[in-house]
Amino acid sequence: MNKPKIALTIAGTDPTGGAGVMADLKSFHACGVYGMAAITSIVAQNTKGVQHIHNLDSHWLEEQMESVFSDELPHALKTGMIASKEMMEIIQMYLKKYDNIPYVIDPVMLAKSGDSLMDDDAKANLQNILLPYATIATPNLPEAEEITGITINDQQSIYQAGNIFINEIGSKGVVIKGGHSSDKNTAIDYLFTQDDVFTFEEPRYDTKHTHGTGCTFSAVITAELAKGKSMFDAVQKAKKFISLSIKHTPEIGLGRGPVNHFAYMKEVGLDDE
């Protein structure tokens, strides 16, 4: 039996399974890679919102990461909810040491419910500590506005934001996601690399059940990079994956429910491996 590719997620929890490391691990599995996880925060949340957040002391994150890296190196890693500057600095230390491992950053600032998931000090230091090491960053429109400091309301401003990520912040790639745009029919994502710009379009589905879409999207990109896929191929797969997961949402919970992390595997299978 061939040894599987390994993807590591560093993020918070979701007891209902829709977001955070729970969503990441399901997405890794659906992409055919072995998932590992290091927890940053214990989050009491459900489809109705966030009830409580307990951020772990940063040394607990360092202990978990050392447990992973001293035993088996991941082929790619991603970060989601990183609550503090101290945690960012620990992650940066590993990114510097293992700079050949692809790194995907989902710059999670708010939950779908609107609850804040990152303190102000962490927000202020995100682009200095972690984003310069990103193989691909995956901000939605509000996150891209927060990071770049510009208002994004048309294609020109999207290109301006992409240029800031690549040429000023130093990320190798960035996907600016269009899920928060006013387009009611199409969801368009823009991938900026150091050489090119690509667009990815999928239908927009009329559903409130989109909890964990950002986590899932970035996890699929991470899984594909772990398998050695290009940025373009990884994002293309993630876009189709998230579109199908929204189309076939299981409608779980009383509020904004999760997506279906296994819809792609059931509809397309693993025939692209």
Question: Which sequence ranges carry the predicted segments?
Answer:
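Short, small-residue alpha-helix embedded
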Residues: 22, 146, 207-231
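Phosphate-handling active-site elements
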Residues: 32-36, 197-198, 224-237
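Conserved phosphate/ATP/ADP-binding segment of small-molecule kinases
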Residues: 120-196
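Conserved N-terminal subdomain of the carbohydrate kinase-like
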Residues: 2-9, 29-112, 268
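Short pre-catalytic strand/loop immediately N-terminal to key active-site residues, enriched for Gly-Thr
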Residues: 10-16, 197-211
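N-terminal phosphate-binding or glycine-rich loops at protein starts, especially the Walker A/P-loop
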Residues: 6-30
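Charged C-terminal helix
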Residues: 55, 232-273
